[in-house]
Amino acid sequence: MAKLRFIVVGSGWRSLFYWRIAQALPERFALCAMLCRTEEKAEKMHREYGVPVSTSAEQCIALHPDLVVVAVNKASIAAVSTEWLARGFAVLCETPAALEEDALRALWQLHRQGAKLQVAEQYWLYPTLAKRLAAVRSGALGTPQFVRLSVAHGYHAVSLARQFLNAGQQPVRVTGRSWTEKIIETDSRWGAVHNGALVEKTLQQHTLEFAGGGTAFLDFNGVQYHSYLRSTHTSVQGERGEVFDDTLRCLDAAGEPVCRQLTPLPDPLAAAAAQAGLNEDETAIACFLDRMQGYLAGGAEVYPLADALQDAYLALLMERALAVPGQSVESTPQPWNTEER
């Protein structure tokens, strides 16, 4: 298989993930250029990281990339993605696809008109989460009824919850509440923090009740992404058993209770990524990029756009629920719920 050639639009923290992936797995990926807004930023990215850079969209177009990765600030993702789709390129945009319902619907309309758009929702490809999803999907728990997630925020959490519960595009009722939590900061995007600073962070809790009967309890504080004092947790329960983090408790074929530890799924690319020094988030994105090859060749979507838009839409409902604690916010039908995909 030929390597995937792509450009990245954006030069922030997230864009560097794609550069590290291309560096770690050069036989599969080639980052042709990073499109920066200013000469100063382009010079900085090239000087500090060795990234091939440009400030000209025309120069990037002339490179004839297979894919355009849009990794700009959240408020600009939808507009920038639309610009590159209009130029005739396939686009993989960072999450969320948009921050407003109208923009989500507009992206769906572009998809219906044939635009090649995917959203880089990667959490289901985390090796630790992939094995838990596989255990649930194996039927070992029976029908998943409850999922408790303290793994990620917003649309990422919604994506996982819907998959663990096999909830698809079901209508949902959302309630939410938030608290301020004091914690000593120990880590960050840029590395460990040792100054003992006591900071205030926001803990958010949401309940999502799906029309099909499954319920998700989402509990997350943004500090969990980078902290030595706060871990993450996953619990999924069905009538025949439970997955709690990496432990599966269930009944065997004879009806006897068994308990076993989940092991990583066989995935040569994930193994190669880890061996090359990529972290779990980068590994998941690398796996997503690799699957984009098939999509670009006319195959199935990597993560259906309808699901990515539903994730973003429900994340908006979660924000609204926080503004009315004790009250519920209900989803309404969206075009991607029912239209042919």
Kindly give the residue locations of the regions a language model identified.
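C-terminal glycine/acidic-rich active-site capping loop/insertion
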Residues: Q224, T232-A306, Q327-S331, N337-R341
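C-terminal helix-rich "cap/oligomerization" subdomain common to oxidoreductases
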Residues: M1-K3, Q59, L67-V69, A115-K116, ...
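Rossmann-like NAD(P)H-binding beta-loop-alpha module
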Residues: P127-F146, A157
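Beta-strand-loop-alpha-helix segment that lines the small-molecule cofactor/substrate pocket
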Residues: D66-L67, N73-K74, A78-W124
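N-terminal Rossmann-like dinucleotide-binding module
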Residues: M1-Y49
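Short acidic low-complexity segments
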Residues: P52-L63
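Short, well-ordered coil/turn residues at beta-beta hairpins
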Residues: A71, E94, F210, D219-F220, ...
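Rossmann-like dinucleotide-binding domain that binds NAD(P)(H)
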Residues: T143-S231
